[in-house]
């Protein structure tokens, strides 16, 4: 098995997100570094394994998505189709585990619009949902659980979390 680097993100309520750095690298390709760059986004796919949320893949921006300098609206059905295909191909193990999008700011934080949309979209979720805003320099990670949005408590780069079997 190939050695792979992961980022681990500690969420409130003792949950840990495990994400290959290759996924984060793909997101960073959409950073809004120039004034003409528009917000982009997609969804996280992965599995829930006890206290872990394992991110396995991500959907990337699609042509049908609506975006501007300060807004992103995921409209393309390809995000849903990709999630459904991975769910089918994994015997219902891989599923939608969260959302990501970019912001045109050095140190990203959720806007009032982000919070309102997440509360509206995710209010029926039974599991914790991973949230990410990709900034120009740093990324904001958080989760939506039980109607509450919380920021991650820490993140680090590791080869593989202790006591975790891939």
For every predicted segment, state its role.
Residues 101-103:
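Histidine-centered divalent metal-coordination motifs
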């Amino acid at each position: 098995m190939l050695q792979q680097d992961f980022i681990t993100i500690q969420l409130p309520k003792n949950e840990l997100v495990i994400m290959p750095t290759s996924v984060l690298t793909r997101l960073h390709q959409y950073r809004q570094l120039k004034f003409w760059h528009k917000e982009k986004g997609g969804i996280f796919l992965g599995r829930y394994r006890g206290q872990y949320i394992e991110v396995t893949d991500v959907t990337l921006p699609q042509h049908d998505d609506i975006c501007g300098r300060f807004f992103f609206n995921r409209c393309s059905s390809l995000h849903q189709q990709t999630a459904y295909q991975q769910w089918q191909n994994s015997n219902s193990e891989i599923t939608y585990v969260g959302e990501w999008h970019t912001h045109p700011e050095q140190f990203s934080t959720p806007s009032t619009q982000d919070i309102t949309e997440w509360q509206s979209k995710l209010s029926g979720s039974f599991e914790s949902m991973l949230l990410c805003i990709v900034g120009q320099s740093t990324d904001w990670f958080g989760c939506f659980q039980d109607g509450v949005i919380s920021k991650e408590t820490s993140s680090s780069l590791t080869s593989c979390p202790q006591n975790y079997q891939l």
